[in-house]
Amino acid sequence: MAELSTIARPYAKAAFDFAIEKNAVESWAEMLSFAAQVSENETMKPLLSGALSSSQLADLFIKVCGEQINEQGQNLIKVMAENGRLEVLPAVYELFHEFSNEWAKEVEASVVSATELSAEQQQQISASLEKRLTRKVKLNCSVDASLVAGVIITAGDLVIDGSVSGKLNRLSEKLQS
């Protein structure tokens, strides 16, 4: 099977373009998030594999989603059901989110540190990343004591490993070669 993002991209792009046109990016993000959660539900998953006809599946899916999905969102669900693609809704949501961040000139950065970062440290990291990436940065911070000290920052394709454990691993690799 083709990679999920390849299958999901046209749906996400169409939804995003429509959302931009209608000035409804936030509401579409919420709809897609909810639909993605429904598609990942353990009760719903078996039904997505072809147990029902596409129209029955679309009707059931829309009924489960209820008021959370508007008429245009329902149309997307129907098209995806007709094409047997409802299982890629989580990937559609992820891509939609990426398109939205790109459009808003935002990037989410994951910061894993050995200890809790202070607000000042978070601000410094955010400012440095914003300067480097020329985008607004939203930090998602977490703590991993196994890093010993330092941080690992991931923003899109950019990975900055400033952790002591990372430095020790690189040193070990150099010594072994």
Swiss-Prot record:
NCBIfam families xref list: ATP_synt_delta, PRK05758.2-2, PRK05758.2-5
Keyword Signal part of the UniProt annotation: no
Gene3D superfamilies: N-terminal domain of the delta subunit of the F1F0-ATP synthase
Entry membrane topology: Peripheral membrane protein
GO molecular function terms listed in the Swiss-Prot or TrEMBL record: proton-transporting ATP synthase activity, rotational mechanism
Record localization: Cell inner membrane
Protein name: ATP synthase subunit delta
Gene that this polypeptide is encoded by: atpH
Subunit structure: F-type ATPases have 2 components, F(1) - the catalytic core - and F(0) - the membrane proton channel. F(1) has five subunits: alpha(3), beta(3), gamma(1), delta(1), epsilon(1). F(0) has three main subunits: a(1), b(2) and c(10-14). The alpha and beta chains form an alternating ring which encloses part of the gamma chain. F(1) is attached to F(0) by a central stalk formed by the gamma and epsilon chains, while a peripheral stalk is formed by the delta and b chains.
Species per Swiss-Prot/TrEMBL record: Shewanella loihica (strain ATCC BAA-1088 / PV-4)
PANTHER family: ATP SYNTHASE DELTA CHAIN
Function noted in UniProt: F(1)F(0) ATP synthase produces ATP from ADP in the presence of a proton or sodium gradient. F-type ATPases consist of two structural domains, F(1) containing the extramembraneous catalytic core and F(0) containing the membrane proton channel, linked together by a central stalk and a peripheral stalk. During catalysis, ATP synthesis in the catalytic domain of F(1) is coupled via a rotary mechanism of the central stalk subunits to proton translocation. This protein is part of the stalk that links CF(0) to CF(1). It either transmits conformational changes from CF(0) to CF(1) or is implicated in proton conduction.
Family: Belongs to the ATPase delta chain family.
Domain of life: Bacteria
GO CC terms: plasma membrane; proton-transporting ATP synthase complex
Keywords of the record: ATP synthesis, Cell inner membrane, Cell membrane, CF(1), Hydrogen ion transport, Ion transport, Membrane, Transport
